[in-house]
């Protein structure tokens, strides 16, 4: 039947997701709290913390310090909708995960995917850099829903 063949193809797609990515087969909203951070490193600025010397400026994402050239991985499957230089963010890649959810990856050394490309959970999409004026190599990482910034640590697990 058509329903069982659709179910089989959905199961095949889910089985192609790396086992280390438990949220791979889930819709983005259902994967909340189950996705890994896109890079291993030390969180140097958290969502909502003061940015620079101005108390009015707050971080709308995370800044994760990591070695130059470290691979940055997609936290969930999606389509690349932006992959270019953006003032203040350096080399920035944005993934659209559907239903208004975006993940943003900035200050990269290199971008490994182009606009229009579909990526799988865990796929390497960029490498850590300090483009856009950072003093040390770090990844800017943010999640947005319909334009609203969300706390990435509510969506991603800190790896042990």
Regions found by a protein language model. Name each.
Residues 44, 79-81, 109, 126-129:
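Conserved positions in beta-strands of structured domains
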Residues 83, 98-118, 122:
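Short histidine-centered loop motifs in beta-beta connectors
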Residues 11-13, 99, 108, 130:
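Detector for Asparagine
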Residues 1-89, 94, 144, 149-160:
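Extracytoplasmic/periplasmic cell wall- or extracellular glycan-interacting regions that localize
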Residues 28-30, 107-108, 129, 138-139:
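Short beta-alpha junctions and helix-cap segments that line functional grooves
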Residues 93, 115-160:
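Conserved, short, structured surface segments that act as functional micro-motifs
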Residues 59, 67-69, 90, 100, ...:
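A generic structural motif
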